[in-house]
Amino acid sequence: SRGDFSLDDSWRTFWQDRVREGHHFGSHTYDHLYFVKDGPSGEIFARPQFGPKAGVMSLYNEASYCREIRRVDERFKELTGTGIQKIWRAPGGKTSPRSIRMGSQCGYQHIGWNPAGFLGDELSSQTHPNKMLLDKASSQLQDGDITMAHLGIWSRKDPWAPAVLEQLIINLKGRGFCFATLPK
């Protein structure tokens, strides 16, 4: 709802506060680059959601894909004085062995999430009310699962965070879960 991007200068204080609190951060690619398919000669085809090539499928070699992952690290360091952890997650969870290898050769470990860990906060509030999402995650998550949620999806009429996130943590702790930061 702010109309800006999370690595804009206006977010500097927010990210500095999160660093001081001890949070860990990874790359999700600078322009939210969706993997499409492997290319013909060791490259990959991907489509950025943002930036000057938004919506245009392009061919990325290892160097250009690495640049896309690393730009987040560089920008985060400009904002906070500290880099991110050397982890990344592909937008939409779309990958191939080649795209994961490209990230790895760039020095970043890919961290996906488990299907049960997709918390559904980007789905429509009308068809996926918060109680349904909470009940599903509370019952289906298993030991070692990695979850994923956006903390501010603009299309949900019934906000997911912080109310559902807090209750989910309470529910999972009630099942004996403990929590850790990545990478581990």
PLM feature spans:
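Acidic-and-aromatic substrate-binding clefts and catalytic sites of carbohydrate-active enzymes
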Residues: 1-10, 33-38, 87-97, 118-130, ...
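Active-site beta->alpha N-cap acidic-glycine motif
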Residues: 1-60, 64, 68-86, 160, ...
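Alpha-helical elements of Rossmann-like donor-binding domains used by nucleotide-donor carbohydrate transfer enzymes
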Residues: 13-14, 71, 98, 132, ...
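Structured helix-beta-strand junction loops
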Residues: 20-22, 106, 143-144, 175
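Structural recognition of the beta-strand scaffold that forms the well-ordered cores
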Residues: 24-29, 86-90, 109-114, 145-150, ...
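His/Asp/Glu-enriched short active-site or ligand-binding loop at hydrolase and phosphoryl-transfer sites
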Residues: 94-140, 176-184
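Catalytic grooves of carbohydrate-active enzymes
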Residues: 134-183
